[in-house]
């Protein structure tokens, strides 16, 4: 994984930032990404019309689930992983299990079937400090009331709704 930073005085394709605060954008490029992913062509219209190749939503869901299960931040959690997990399930996006398995093998030297993955996920969901999860994501949520339903049980029930591709 290679990292670089764009600062507020960096010109990239004539992009500049007009803000009072200093803006930094971290860009990471995975030079050896896990394989068995799926892509699709998408048309974007701004700043001008162009076609781009991107990961499919099921493949992105696999990356998010890998992060949710394996991300190690000592005692901290990343609330955005939980928010995104809810988003994928809410939008009925199937999970690309083949890519998830490839990620676990490459980064964690683990092989598992769907049942074992769901067990690992449920353990993570049950053990998390949900107040810490909420506190981490709160600054990014427009309506804090959305988080009132969040509980360990809520996420365990979401896990039962995962569809596999």
Place the predicted regions along the sequence by residue.
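Structured mid-to-C-terminal alpha-helical surface segments
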Residues: 1-165
């Amino acid at each position: 994984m290679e990292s670089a930073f764009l600062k507020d005085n960096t010109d990239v394709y004539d992009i500049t930032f007009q803000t009072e605060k200093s803006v930094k954008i971290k860009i990471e490029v995975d030079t050896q990404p896990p394989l068995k992913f799926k892509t699709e062509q998408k048309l974007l219209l701004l700043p001008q019309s162009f076609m781009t190749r991107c990961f499919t939503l099921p493949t992105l869901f696999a990356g998010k689930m890998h992060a949710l299960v394996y991300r190690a931040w000592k005692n901290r959690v990343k609330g955005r992983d939980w928010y995104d997990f809810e988003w994928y399930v809410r939008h009925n996006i199937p999970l690309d299990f083949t890519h998830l398995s490839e990620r676990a093998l490459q980064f964690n030297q683990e092989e598992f079937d769907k049942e074992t993955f769901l067990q690992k996920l449920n353990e993570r969901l049950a053990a998390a400090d949900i107040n810490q999860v909420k506190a981490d994501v709160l600054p990014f949520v427009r309506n804090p009331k959305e988080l009132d339903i969040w509980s360990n049980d809520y996420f365990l029930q979401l896990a039962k709704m995962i569809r596999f591709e």
